[in-house]
Every structure is written in C-alpha cells, then in structure tokens.
Regions:
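An amphipathic, aromatic/His-enriched active-site/gating alpha helix that lines ligand/cofactor pockets
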Residues: 28-31, 52-77
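Short S/T/G/P-rich N-terminal loop/turn motif that feeds into the first structured element of a domain
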Residues: 1-27, 39, 43, 54-55, ...
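Short, flexible, solvent-exposed loop/turn segments with mixed acidic/basic and small polar residues
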Residues: 34-38
Length: 88
C-alpha cells in the first residue's frame, strides 16, 4: 500500500487525541496511521500513513476535523550514509 507523509498545522497547541475515534474513521476510509512527529511548540505534526490514495487521507482528515495541509507520497528513505532504501 502507498505511504504518505502529511504535514498538519494547528491553530493552537495540540492536546490529547481521541485515538479510538480516529482509528474508527481511518478504518472506514482504509487509512492506517503509522506514527507522527510533533513540533516543539505542539502546533505542527508530520505524520506517516498508509492509504490507497491522498484522497482517502484527505477524506479521513475532513471527517476527523483535523488539517491535512500537505500530503506527499513517499517511496524511499535516505540513510545517513547517503544510500536510498525502498519502503517495505
């Protein structure tokens, strides 16, 4: 399944999320949240997801009432030695 990086900008500091509610929406949209990075000011996240398409991620975000400012499909990682690795 394709992997996407999502950048989310929040107007206020991010607080605890309703993980069960998000999982239910994501399951219905065939989206799997892998993990996220949270900025120091807690107003921006960079999230890694598996989904069939960017549209599925956008639909899940709209239903959950959270932003999905930038959605980019990613296919490889770059290692510290400069080599590229395909995502599993």
């Amino acid at each position: 399944m394709p992997v996407f990086m999502i950048e989310r900008q929040f107007a206020e500091e991010l607080e605890a999320v309703d993980a069960a509610g998000l999982k239910e929406i994501n399951d219905e949209e065939s989206v799997q949240w892998l993990y996220s990075f949270l900025s120091k000011d807690k107003r921006k996240t960079y999230c890694l997801y598996e989904a069939e398409s960017a549209d599925a991620i956008r639909a899940a975000a709209e239903r959950a009432g959270i932003p999905a400012d930038v959605i980019v499909e990613v296919t490889q990682t770059i290692q510290p030695d400069g080599s590229f690795s395909s995502l599993p």
